[in-house]
Amino acid sequence: MLQSIVLSVCMFMLHTVAASGPQSYQKLDFTNVGFTGSYVDVNKFKDITNNESCTCEVGDRVWFSGKNAPLADYLSVHFRGPLKLKQFAFYTSPGFTVNNSRSSSDWNRLAYYESSSKTADNVTFLNHGGEASPCLGNALSYASSNGTGSASEATVLADGTLISSDQEYIIYSNVSCPKSGYDKGCGVYRSGIPAYYGYGGTTKMFLFEFEMPTETEKNSSSIGYYDLPAIWLLNDHIARTSQYPTNANCSCWASGCGEYDIFEAMNGTEKNHLYSTFHTFQGIEDLGTGIQSYGYITRNTTGTMKGGVVFDSSGNVVSFISDATPFNGTVSADTVNDLLAAIPENETYSSQLMSISATAPSTTSKSNGVALTKMQNGVWYYILAIFTAFTQVVLI
């Protein structure tokens, strides 16, 4: 009976919100980000070039906890065309809270790319140009200067490089991984690949200057993401093992090690709407759909966009677009908070993630894993999300 009432209310509110549709914003906020949970990582590859026996084995559960978890781990930065990258910067801070500069510290830039000068500090461009595997897909390789070809060594992306629909490249740091191994710093990864760490820390900021022009090439059935550009973050283990596996055991992604889409065009009917989405199990069962902001950022197809994402120390994650985005070596806490505060409330969409409780066992193994989400938790997440969207529509 209660479930029927809940679903009826959900349908009514969803109909009301859907009638108006998602709105355009300059800033997409998520609060209460981070929970205690676990995922399974790849422990062993087997026969990775054999069509019949290619497979992967997973190890014990890896537990995580705290603000922004599991995205407090090392992350790689991914780009899909049509896109032209002009600047990229990664920052960390000893402590930063959105809207509270008094208790926040400045941001220090630890990685930087600028296209016209070909500056590339602590940046390595990779793509999926390596050896093919029937269960793992293509391995990582160094990207050539055009982003899509392969190179024999680390190469800086050329100025003005435009990648087309479906084409991707990745940015990792220039810090080399230790030897492949389940208990090593980078986990198990494929032999022969250029293996680097991503960018870590609970409190971090990724900034971008970029273009997302309308695709000029003709569409075809071989293009999976036609005119759907994106910038997103993945747990850095994923691409080193398999970003696009045919076997779910060949990547920690399916068990929830972490993805955050900063700016992503989701489908052809909304190709100029850039959404932010969490692909974690923080209150939802459908990892593929994820936890998406109901609002979107408008894609500028004729000019340059500046913006990025802030992961603060208190579990707030903010995607934003602003022409005032700085790329200095040091950015003060006041500068970041003033930039975010300058975006009006009616240009801000806020979502709160669910609180999830789980306790890591004293000894962990695959059999000790717990179900992190229940059906009722998923229902309550949708109620909260729909209610938030309904409230936003009423206030506009």
Curated annotation (Swiss-Prot):
Any Gene Ontology CC annotation: plasma membrane
Position of sequence motif ExDxxE motif: 259-264
Superkingdom classification of source: Eukaryota
Residues covalently joined to lipid (GPI-anchor amidated asparagine): N368
Residue numbers covered by the propeptide annotation in the UniProt entry: 369-396
Post-translational modifications: Extensively N-glycosylated.
Induction: Induced in response to cell wall damage and DNA replication stress.
Pfam families in UniProt: YJL171C_Tos1_C, YJL171C_Tos1_N
InterPro entries the UniProt entry points to: YJL171C/Tos1_C, YJL171C/Tos1_N
GO molecular function: hydrolase activity, acting on glycosyl bonds
Compartment(s): Cell membrane
Residues carrying a glycan: N51, N99, N122, N146, N174, N219, N249, N267, N300, N328, N346
Domain commentary: The conserved ExDxxE motif might be important for catalytic activity.
Additional free-text comment from the UniProt record: Present with 5525 molecules/cell in log phase SD medium.
Entry function: Probable circularly permuted 1,3-beta-glucanase involved in cell wall modification through beta-1,3-glucan network alterations such as increased branching or remodeling.
PANTHER family documented for this protein: CELL WALL PROTEIN YJL171C, PROTEIN TOS1
Protein's name according to its UniProt entry: Probable circularly permuted 1,3-beta-glucanase YJL171C
